A protein has these predicted regions:
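C-terminal catalytic histidine-bearing segment of alpha/beta-hydrolase fold enzymes
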Residues: 68, 75-128
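The feature captures the conserved acid-bearing segment of alpha/beta-hydrolase catalytic domains
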Residues: 18, 24-85
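Short secondary-structure capping/turn micro-motifs that flank functional sites
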Residues: 2, 25, 90-92
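Conserved hydrolase catalytic core segment
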Residues: 7-17
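Glycine-rich nucleophile elbow surrounding the catalytic serine of serine-hydrolase chemistry
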Residues: 1-7
Length: 128
């Protein structure tokens, strides 16, 4: 998910034009508990790709504190970053078999956000 996207973007920046992460963890899932709670992954500090986070506000598996810290770390370095939170949406709201009406709307909205984000940053002549 999100962590592997940032990991790839940090290791191969010329190969990653933009990131759109649903439910993205911004810390190595194998990192120690203190790191998972109190810091962002070191890779976040190397990212130059525009980054879009899309998360459901009912996704309780995410460490939101890391997403917030990653957002601010990217912003402070001048990396284009946006955070979209979807009210009433649970983890994997974009493809749940048991999606609520709100999650179905959130999934449609998220698809449009991702399409626009990628058009803007991957294909700038067509996306602007």
């Amino acid at each position: 998910g999100g962590y592997y996207a940032i990991r790839l973007a940090a290791k191969r920046p010329k190969d990653v034009a933009a990131i759109a992460a649903y439910a993205g963890h911004m810390q190595d899932p194998n990192a120690g508990e203190p790191d998972q709670l109190f810091s962002v992954a070191p890779e976040v500090l190397k990212i130059t790709a525009p980054t879009l986070y899309l998360i459901g506000d009912q996704d309780f598996e995410l460490r939101r504190i890391n997403i917030g810290r990653a957002f601010y770390a990217l912003y402070e370095r001048g990396v284009p970053v946006e955070l979209q939170t979807y009210p009433l949406a649970r983890r994997a709201f974009d493809f749940r078999a048991d999606a609520t009406p709100e999650e179905k709307i959130a999934a449609r909205h998220a698809r449009e956000r991702v399409k626009g984000w990628l058009a803007r940053w991957v294909c700038p002549k067509q996306g602007r």
